[in-house]
Amino acid sequence: MAKYNIAISLGCTNTRILKTGVGVVLNEPTLLLLDLNSKKNPVLAVGDDIKNIHNKTTSMQCVSPVKNGNIVNKEYAKIMLNKFLEKVGEKKFFRGSLLWLTPTSLSENDKNEYVNLGYSLGYKNVSILPSAVAGFQELEIDMDNRHAHMLVDIGGGCTDVSVVVRGKVLQGCTAGIGGRDVDSSIVNLLNDAFETKISLEKAKEIKESVNTILPNDQLGCNVMIVDEFGAGSELAISARELRDVYLTFFMKVCNCITSVINMCPNEIVADINKTGIYLCGGLANFTGLDKFIRSKIGIPVYAVERPEFTSMFGCEKLFNEPEKLSHLVTLNS
């Protein structure tokens, strides 16, 4: 039975690292900054360190080695993760057992990519556990009972919908929709409605500041914009103006949930109707989201606390129960 000393969640937008006995030690963007003019050493910085690179040029480009939960560039993923691991004190020649927290619907080939990447990082033992299974440990739901539970993880790059029964993923899907799509829609909205161009990063700030879909919410924010002559001014954006963008996105999430429910046997659907749907991920903290999804699907919906770290905190609890963790890994392999 492997005793894991580290867990990694390689997300589309953020990478998180958990160390046993310590907790979450890293939460940084899943990004590398490349110098396109350099062939030998194109990687200039990774994660948060990219912000420290000033005077960026057109020959520099940010890339992510992950798309929809899948590793699309193993070499860049290895470079980025080695730098992250060194940052948290994981020396190359003293790496023990690694646990990947992954999306639900990975193919066998995708799983092998994660395992092989783990070995290439120098770990002696590498295993995989669906993030949803770890997440339910944080929610302190008794997974030994025979009832099915649903977890919806709305992340930055994808949305993971999972049905878990007695610690095993029974049904699920990973859809390529996430917070980045909302950011792009905000950029388009400001361009169309106000003839104002903003960056995706600025759109993300707006989304995080005005995170409500309640119809009468007075929440809003001011956006500093610069015109073509370099003059700055403030533009006020209200929740009402953003609401259609948000509802369009969350309706797609509802469609994902419905499609997974439709794939389940009647007795599983009956369970979910009783146990409800749990929301986690970065976009789960939108005010009114639980009520919106319930109104569309007709099933109780629960927003969890600290939704961005649900699977990480659940995994931390499992690190303290190695036999249970080993059982869950085997059950979902």
Regions found by a protein language model. Give the residues of each.
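C-terminal, charged low-complexity interaction regions
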Residues: G155-G156
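Nucleotide/phosphate-binding catalytic cleft detector across ATP-hydrolyzing
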Residues: M1-P29, L33-L151, V164-I277, A284-S311, ...
